[in-house]
Regions:
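N-terminal lobe/hinge region of extracytoplasmic solute-binding protein
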Residues: 46-94, 125, 192
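Structural transition elements
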Residues: 309-343, 353-360
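Ligand-site clamp/hinge motif
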Residues: 212-258
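Periplasmic-binding protein-like
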Residues: 281-322, 360-361, 462-467
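Gly/Pro-rich hinge or "lid" segments in bacterial periplasmic/extracellular proteins
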Residues: 168-219, 225
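Surface-exposed binding/hinge segments that line
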Residues: 92, 98-102, 136-179, 201
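Long beta-strand-rich cores associated with HINT superfamily self-processing modules
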Residues: 478-505
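Extracytoplasmic/peripheral linker and loop segments enriched in polar/acidic and small residues
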Residues: 384-386, 416-481, 505
Length: 505
């Protein structure tokens, strides 16, 4: 199969909930000259979550670079979750394990280094060898070879029809050779990418600053730069839109929507599910019958109706209505174990405050669980302060909000990351060879009905074991002040500001 460069990218109206703009003090908003002689100032963004890993590009922080157009990958996903050209203009699959990528001419890194096959190989090799590799790489090993100045050949250790989608993950953004080489494994992302905006400052967990890159290979950005702030408090994000301290804000809490001018409210139907991951490895939920009891106790409709006020749908499975094929292919998702009696069983229910609804869900979930006999202790923090503990199985149950399309645009890969033995996001600590076999078989299929069927078979197997409790499928509100136009509303949560984002008028 061969994929060639197309004119125009297919991001037409990808409806999303991504991102945001900075609070006061980050920028005066003063206009600066743009290369075409027009005037365009700086965009202010209010992000929801602070950096999780000091803006390391192999972590979820990579999505912030992507949303700010501060980094680029070989390919990117279009509105249908299909790969399309970016730094690679063409790719072809030469056998079950081998892909050849042709690179774009005329690209330079922001530090002046040439963009070529050696640089691409260096990035992919460094990412693959990292002790914390990109999550999209889980389950697949890559080897690379330079086969021309503008050609890289990549081999996988297993048949993988989704390699281009994996390489579209922002965690595979290409950086200059100067970004690598630090003994601690860190990557210097300041001024070393190819994007239309150049990162100039990282101020801990408070702000980022970016300036326009005037030698960008494509259309030079209209905005002079971006000032991004991290505002985990949802009320503060909403207030920043009302006051004009932010031009765009990520994930406005449902409780704050009515306080905004309707013109500022942009609803995005998301492939995002809130679920309660249960620790299947240790503690009370190692018993499938106890998991079944917890699952039977949760009233999804009550949570959707009271907390989300119409901005979410009760969940039956892990995959929701944003994937129109999921419901018709859904198998038996009922627990295979009968619920146990759980009077007096003590559990810790954890969640994070970054998503304003999560603590409210925790309150309702606690009441519902205690009604059947559980004794519940809550542990609620900011995400950055609990991620490592979650991934190591430090809690009995964790309320999680998860975009099932975020890494590869492929829900099968997302489920594999969350519920396979080697999954990089396996909060439930599930390890079942039968489920892993479903994943391995599904990876062989090209995107289409057979892969969709494998995805739903995996979902059914996970839910029959009650490894998690689906709660709601979310619709997210992106707040826009009305000062700029051209913000992306992206369900894959990887684009927000582009080179074409421009002032109103």
């Amino acid at each position: 199969m061969n994929y060639r460069l197309r004119k125009g990218y297919a991001w037409l109206g990808a409806v999303a909930a991504l991102t945001a703009l900075a609070l006061s003090g980050c920028s005066t908003g003063q206009a600066e000259g743009s290369p075409d002689g027009g005037q365009a100032g700086r965009i202010k963004v209010a992000f929801m979550q602070p950096p999780k890993a000091a803006m390391h590009p192999y972590s979820d922080d990579a999505f912030k670079y992507s949303r700010l157009s501060a980094s680029e990958t070989l390919v990117r996903l279009n509105a249908d979750a299909g790969p399309e050209p970016l730094l690679a203009t063409e790719w072809k699959k030469t056998d079950d394990l081998t892909w050849v990528f042709t690179l774009r001419d005329g690209v330079t890194f922001q530090d002046g280094a040439p963009f070529n096959a050696e640089a691409v190989k260096n990035t992919i090799d460094h990412a693959s060898a990292s002790t914390t590799p990109p999550r999209a790489l889980k389950g697949v090993k890559l080897t690379t070879k330079v086969t021309g100045d503008n050609e890289v050949t990549i081999k996988t250790d297993i048949a993988d029809a989704m390699l281009p989608n994996r390489l579209a993950s922002p965690q595979f953004s290409i950086f200059s050779p100067a970004a690598y080489g630090n003994k601690d494994g860190s990557v210097n992302t300041i001024g070393t990418s190819t994007g239309p905006f150049k990162l100039t400052e990282i101020n801990g967990s408070s702000t980022l600053k970016l300036d326009r890159y005037d030698d960008y290979w494509g259309d030079v950005a209209i905005a002079a730069g971006i000032d991004a702030s991290f505002v985990p408090d949802g009320t503060a994000r909403a207030a920043s839109i009302r006051s004009g301290e932010a031009d765009v804000a990520e994930t406005i809490p449902v409780s704050q929507v009515s306080l905004l001018d309707p013109k500022m409210v942009n609803e995005v139907y998301m492939p995002r599910t809130t679920h309660i991951a249960l620790n299947t490895k240790s503690g009370p939920f190692a018993d499938p019958a106890v998991r079944a009891a917890a699952r039977a106790a949760i009233d999804q409709k009550a949570i959707a109706d009271t907390i989300y006020e119409g901005y979410a749908d009760p969940a039956v499975g892990i995959l929701g209505p944003a994937l129109p094929w999921a419901e018709s292919l859904r198998g038996d998702v009922k627990s295979s174990a009968a619920p146990a009696k759980v009077e007096g069983v003590k559990i810790t229910l954890a969640t994070y405050t970054d998503r304003a609804e999560n603590p409210e869900i925790a309150v309702q979930a606690q009441a519902q669980l205690e009604k059947v006999g559980f004794v519940v202790t809550q542990d609620v923090r900011e995400y950055a302060n609990m991620e490592e503990e979650m991934l190591k199985g430090g809690f009995d149950a964790v309320i999680v909000s998860r975009n099932t399309m975020i890494d590869t645009g492929d829900p099968l890969s997302a489920l594999m990351q969350d519920f396979s033995c080697e999954g990089g996001n396996n909060i439930s600590q599930l390890c079942d060879p039968k489920i892993d076999a479903i994943f391995s078989e599904g990876l062989k299929f090209e995107p289409g009905e057979e892969r969709q069927k494998a995805t739903m078979a995996a979902e059914a197997a996970v839910l029959q074991r009650s490894a998690t409790i689906p709660v709601t499928h979310e619709r997210v509100v992106q707040g826009e002040q009305g000062t700029w136009v051209g913000f992306e509303r992206d369900p894959f949560e990887r684009r927000l500001i582009t080179e074409h984002t421009k002032p109103v008028g």
